[in-house]
Amino acid sequence: VITAPQLRAARALLGLDQRQLAELCGLSVPTIQRMEASDGTVRGTVDSLMKLIDALERGGIELIGEGQISSGGRGVRLKSPAAPSEPGLP
């Protein structure tokens, strides 16, 4: 599960605009825009959500879910620099 604020933060950490993220995910720009505009949890088809999360994780993003160790609740962070990066991602 990913929230709209997590999605926007993850995209910002990777230095991507909506078009670039859409290309990496194989989704349309309007789909990314709708996901980022969601209230709370991002809505979409299971396939779209899996593509999105997979692309973010390949870029080195770690999603911090509710109940995971974090003083601020849900969030995102970059994995250690030793994690391999996908071509086209920083």
Where are these regions (language model features)?
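Short basic helix-loop element that most often maps to the first helix and adjoining turn
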Residues: L7-Q20, P81
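Residue-level recognition of specific faces of alpha-helices
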Residues: Q6, T31-R34, G75
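Recognition helix of helix-turn-helix/homeodomain-like DNA-binding domains
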Residues: G26-G44
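A detector for short, charged/polar N-terminal pre-domain segments
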Residues: V1-I2
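DNA-binding alpha-helical recognition surfaces that contact promoter or target DNA
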Residues: A9, E23, R34, D54
